[in-house]
Design a protein with these regions (language model features):
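Electropositive polyanion-binding surfaces
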Residues: 1-277, 296-316
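Surface-exposed acidic, glycine/proline-enriched linker/cap segments
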Residues: 272-291
Length: 317
């Protein structure tokens, strides 16, 4: 009994909730929704306000239960909005672009995974994720899958959510911290009051919300990166295993899972060669000596210079 020791009322409520949660998980699997397991950093601070240790956030059953219940609430709200308004607030997630899927397929092959980016395989991505469960580099591979996806956005027309495999989806559960949720609550209230409230300039408002969401996400990541950079100064000169998470004509972005961070390996630090940037294969190809560095490749790097204020780590090969 998972809830032994609780008072009767709480025990019954939690037992019923857990039973419903299990049924929702089965429906999630039946739909083919994506379940990405990506390590999220938790910064453990000391009394002086500096990062003492970086660990991975634990995802408990309680977190999953609440998440599934919130998804159901969001879907119910979206269904009601679609029935009552020609335009409303929807959280859409488009089908992934073919070029990104092609890159994902190539990156997986380099890690011994034969997966072709066909339409059937894209719709059955959960089967691929299931194959990755027992691999030690699971989190890295899941991040590759995430990077191949489109960004979700707020839009007035309902287009569905690819990742969650819902025909209609919106954000309803957090009106105190997300403006789109507040709009959804106002629209739902107008349905209850039988006085439908049509919002002017809705498309512009939702586009603004999507932009600000990206800005807030970027700012949050930058703050975390700056704090992690301070923590990483103690590792300057040390060697770490990483993987190439981005390729540009000027160098490589390398993720270092052990440190929960990303650094830049400038092209000048690579083995001597004349490198060409191949946008399609996302690689730096050496014309003279045949060196090649491709998105998804494993790579050993040294921590070089660190700029805490800029949140940047320079790497050496």
């Amino acid at each position: 009994n998972k809830f032994e020791g609780l008072e009767g009322t709480y025990q019954q409520s939690l037992a019923a909730s857990y039973l419903l949660f299990q049924k929702l998980l089965k429906l999630r699997n039946y739909r083919g929704a994506l379940e990405l397991d990506i390590a999220e950093p938790v910064l453990n601070m000391n009394s002086q306000g500096f990062v003492q240790k970086v660990t991975s956030r634990r995802r408990l059953v309680a977190h999953q239960l609440i998440e599934e219940f919130m998804l159901v609430a969001n879907v119910c709200a979206a269904n009601l909005l679609k029935k009552n308004f020609p335009q409303s607030v929807f959280r859409n997630h488009d089908y992934p672009e073919s070029l990104k899927i092609d890159r994902l397929s190539q990156s997986l092959k380099k890690r011994g995974l034969n997966w072709e980016g066909t339409a059937e395989n894209i719709n059955n991505l959960p089967k691929l994720l299931e194959r990755l469960k027992s691999r030690p580099d699971k989190s890295t591979l899941h991040m590759m899958v995430l990077q191949s996806m489109q960004r979700a956005a707020y839009e007035p027309e309902c287009k569905g959510h690819f990742g969650l495999k819902y025909d209609e989806y919106t954000h309803f559960t957090s009106p105190i911290r997300r403006y789109p949720d507040l709009i959804v609550h106002r629209l739902l209230k107008s349905i209850i009051d039988k006085n439908l409230n049509v919002i002017e300039n809705l498309e512009e408002i939702l586009e603004h919300c999507s932009t600000k969401e990206r800005d807030a996400e970027f700012a949050s990541k930058q703050v975390i990166q700056c704090l992690i950079c301070c923590h990483c100064k103690q590792f300057i000169g040390q060697n770490f295993k990483g993987y190439i998470s981005g390729v540009k004509d000027f160098g490589l972005f390398v993720d270092i899972p052990e440190l929960f961070t990303t650094g830049m390996l400038h092209v000048s630090e690579l083995p001597s060669d004349r490198y060409n940037f191949n946008a399609r294969s996302q690689s730096l190809d050496g014309r003279r000596r045949g060196n090649k560095f491709t998105h998804g490749d494993k790579i050993d790097v040294y921590i070089g210079e660190i700029s805490e204020l800029e949140g940047k780590i320079s790497l050496y090969y």
